[in-house]
Amino acid sequence: MTNIRKTHPLTKIINNSFIDLPAPSNISAWWNFGSLLGICLIIQILTGLFLAMHYTSDTATAFSSVTHICRDVNYGWIIRYMHANGASMFFICLFLHVGRGLYYGSYMFTETWNIGIILLFAVMATAFMGYVLPWGQMSFWGATVITNLLSAIPYIGTNLVEWIWGGFSVDKATLTRFFAFHFILPFIISALAAVHLLFLHETGSNNPSGIPSDSDKIPFHPYYTIKDILGALLLILMLTLLVLFSPDLLGDPDNYIPANPLNTPPHIKPEWYFLFAYAILRSIPNKLGGVLALIFSILILAIIPLLHTSKQRSMMFRPLSQCLFWLLVADLLTLTWIGGQPVEHPFIIIGQLASILYFMILLVLMPIISIIENNMLKW
C-alpha cells in the first residue's frame, strides 16, 4: 500500500518540504530562524486579524479604538501587546537570519537571497504602516517625517507625497490606506516566503562549513522538527515574558498621547528596529543623499554575492573575515543607539563615522580581507 503522505498532491508538497526533506547533518541553531520567522508571521497575522475586528481606521476614533481594545475587549490587551512585541521578535529573528546568511555565505544562493531582500523590504513597509495605525503622537509624526522623504525625489517628489497622503498632510485618507496596506501585505509576505522556500529547496540548505553536503544528508523529520520546536518554545517564552512583564519596554511613551498636528514631539524617532537605518539617513546633511543612503543601506545586501572574493564560502575558517563581521555587528548596534539620540554633538559625528564604516566594511574591507586570506592560504 502506498503512503498517502507521499502520493497525495497536497500532502506530497508538505512531505517534501518539512518531513522527508534531505537536510545537512551539521546545521546549527543559526538555521532555526527560518522556522521562527514563519511562526512570527503566523502570530502576527492571527493577532492582527483579531485586532482588526475591533480597530477603526478613522482619525477621530483610531486612538480610542485601540484604548477600547485594551480596556473592554476580552483579553484585548494581550492580543495588542502580542502584536506590538511580536513585531520586535520578528525583527530580531530577521536580523539574526540575515546575519547568519552573511556569515556562512548563504547569499551564494542568489535567488533565495534576492527574494529574502524583497521580503525584508516588505516586512519593513508593513511594520512602518502598522506603527501609524494607533494614531498616537509618534505614529502621526513618524508617518509625516518618513513619507515626506519622498519629496526629495527630483521633479515628481511633492506630487508623489501628496498622492500617498491623499491630501495636503497626513490625515484620514492616509490612515485608511495605511490600514488597507497593512492588512494585505502580510499575505503577500506569506506568498513570498513560500517562493523563498521553493528556491531554497531547489539547491538544498547551506551548512556552517560552507562545503557541499550532498553526500551526508539526514531527513528533516524528526531531527530538525524537534530542533525547531525547541527554538519555537524559546521564542514564545521570550515573547510571553516581554508581553506579560514589560509590554511597553520597546515602545515610545509619546504614542500614548493622541496625534496632534499642532504639537511636534521633542524627538521624533521610529521603533528600535529602524533606528540603524534612521541614523544613516540623519548622518547625511543633504535630504536626497540621506534618502539614497537609507535605501542603499538595505539594498547593499543585493550586491553582497558580487563582492564575494573568497575561495571559501563560509567564514567558519576565516578569522580575519570573522573579525570584520563582528565589527559590522558592533557598528550596527552603534547606529541603533545613535538613531535614538538627539541630533547634537557628539552623536552627529559618531553617527557619521558609524555610517561610513558600515558601507566601508561591506563594500571595501570584506572583499579585500577575503583576497588577503586567499593569499595567506596560497589559494
UniProtKB/Swiss-Prot annotation:
Q: Which PROSITE patterns match?
A: CYTB_CTER, CYTB_NTER
One GO cellular component assignment for this chain's record is: respiratory chain complex III
Pfam families the UniProt entry points to? Cytochrom_B_C, Cytochrome_B
TM regions (residue ranges): 33-53, 77-98, 113-133, 178-198, 226-246, 288-308, 320-340, 347-367
Query: Which GO terms fall under biological process for this protein?
Result: mitochondrial electron transport, ubiquinol to cytochrome c
Q: Which cofactor does it need?
A: heme b
- The positions annotated for binding heme b b566 are 97, 196
Could you give a GO molecular-function term held by this entry? Answer: metal ion binding
Q: How does it sit in the membrane?
A: Multi-pass membrane protein
The record's annotation in InterPro entries points to:
Cyt_b/b6_C (IPR005798), Cyt_b/b6_C_sf (IPR036150), Cyt_b/b6_N (IPR005797), Cytb/b6-like_sf (IPR027387), Cytochrome_b (IPR030689), Cytochrome_b_C_euk/bac (IPR048260), Cytochrome_b_N_euk/bac (IPR048259), Di-haem_cyt_TM (IPR016174)
User: What is written in the cofactor note of this entry?
Assistant: Binds 2 heme b groups non-covalently.
Instruction: Return the CDD domains for the record.
Output: cytochrome_b_C, Cytochrome_b_N
Chain coiled-coil ranges: none
Q: Which domain of life is it from?
A: Eukaryota
Chain sites annotated for binding a ubiquinone: 201
Subcellular localization, per the record? Answer: Mitochondrion inner membrane
User: Quick one: which residues bind heme b b562?
Assistant: 83, 182
More about this protein? Heme 1 (or BL or b562) is low-potential and absorbs at about 562 nm, and heme 2 (or BH or b566) is high-potential and absorbs at about 566 nm.
Quaternary data = The cytochrome bc1 complex contains 11 subunits: 3 respiratory subunits (MT-CYB, CYC1 and UQCRFS1), 2 core proteins (UQCRC1 and UQCRC2) and 6 low-molecular weight proteins (UQCRH/QCR6, UQCRB/QCR7, UQCRQ/QCR8, UQCR10/QCR9, UQCR11/QCR10 and a cleavage product of UQCRFS1). This cytochrome bc1 complex then forms a dimer.
PANTHER family, alphabetized? CYTOCHROME B (PTHR19271:SF16)
What the record says about family reads:
Belongs to the cytochrome b family.
Question: What name appears for this protein in its UniProt entry?
Answer: Cytochrome b
